[in-house]
Amino acid sequence: MDMENNLQDLKKKFNDIERNLENPTNLSQKEFITLSKEYSELRPIIKIIDEYNTLKEEISDLEEIMKDENSEGDIKELAKEEFFEKHKVLLPKIKAKLKLALLPKDEDDSRNAILEIRAGTGGEEAALFAAMLFRMYQKYAERRNWKFEPISISNTGIGGYKEASALINGTEVFARLKFESGVHRVQRVPETESSGRLHTSAATVAILPEVEEVDFKIEEKDLRIDVYRSSGPGGQSVNTTDSAVRVTHLPTGIVVIQQDEKSQHKNKAKALKVLRARLYEIERQKKEMERSTMRKSQIGSGDRSERIRTYNFPQSRITDHRINLTSHRLEQIIKEGELDEFIEALISRNEAERLAGES
């Protein structure tokens, strides 16, 4: 009965919001934006509620036909078959769909994301793998019509990336990419390997929700900002002005270096954006750890030390170890960014775990 009351309350809330938005003259701009956001979030849930209520009415009508002594035998039989289909098959499905829609949303899912990739163990091979992953996510962003804006790239000079970061803007970026955080491992024969021996190397991926200054404030007194001349591969100076910026967050010791832009002001803004995202993610992880004491997630917490996926080139195979999903479409995934098979499976597993945790 509680669920029925909740559905009625949601429906009433939605109708009230709809009425307010139809007469926006009484609303401030801030109120209008807030209500519009609520409306767009509630609309898909209301659609499922309407489907659920319609189905219940149809089931009730069929019950009446089955009970009616004046109904003909053939009509009763048809009603019985339809009742079974709707009551035993469709109703449980729509109830599950409704429960999922009513689960509390991750407030960060609608945010843009900052992608950070660092070469791990494996020397130059790891750096080449890091560059490959960076391009893979860039391709995936293109497939989804997201904007992919590189923030910083530290080249090795021969095609590899020691580390690289990018800001990804678009719809549900963090929601779809958040399970990519962790250690990605590659197994392949390097082009420089004359004996044909298989090498294993790794790169670390971090997906951070982008946060604006109004959402997460950093105290000026907690920052040390150093400026210096930017340098390229091998350490040679590539700029004649002090445009490179190093921002140190004193309480945590986190350091962000930004030197890709020629303007010191732009480098500082980018460095602060990355720092804000990293600090926000630390807070996020704390909250997630508190929640995970009640609900152990099988697909991982986004811990960057957790090995999540292996890319095996000789066998053209990619395996996600959290959900035991293997694909032999390595080339399409790496070169074309066809990641949806893994991303959809991870989202589905997470939803199933959340539903199980609520029951």
Swiss-Prot record:
Compartment(s): Cytoplasm
GO cellular component: cytoplasm
Record PTM: Methylated by PrmC. Methylation increases the termination efficiency of RF1.
NCBIfam families: prfA, PRK00591.1
Stated name of the protein: Peptide chain release factor 1
Organism: Wolbachia pipientis wMel
Region of interest called Disordered, as start-end residue ranges on this chain: 286-305
Gene3D superfamilies hit by this protein: 3.30.160.20, 3.30.70.1660, 6.10.140.1950
Listed SMART domains: PCRF (SM00937)
Family listed: Belongs to the prokaryotic/mitochondrial release factor family.
A Pfam family annotated for this UniProt entry: PCRF
Keywords linked to the UniProt accession: Cytoplasm, Methylation, Protein biosynthesis
Described purpose of this protein according to its UniProt entry: Peptide chain release factor 1 directs the termination of translation in response to the peptide chain termination codons UAG and UAA.
Superkingdom in the source lineage: Bacteria
Keyword Lyase: no
Modification N5-methylglutamine, positions: Q236
Main subcellular location: cytoplasm
GO MF, one annotated term: translation release factor activity, codon specific
Annotated InterPro entries: PCRF (IPR005139), Pep_chain_release_fac_I (IPR000352), Pep_chain_release_fac_I_sf (IPR045853), Prokaryotic/Mito_RF (IPR050057), RF-1 (IPR004373)
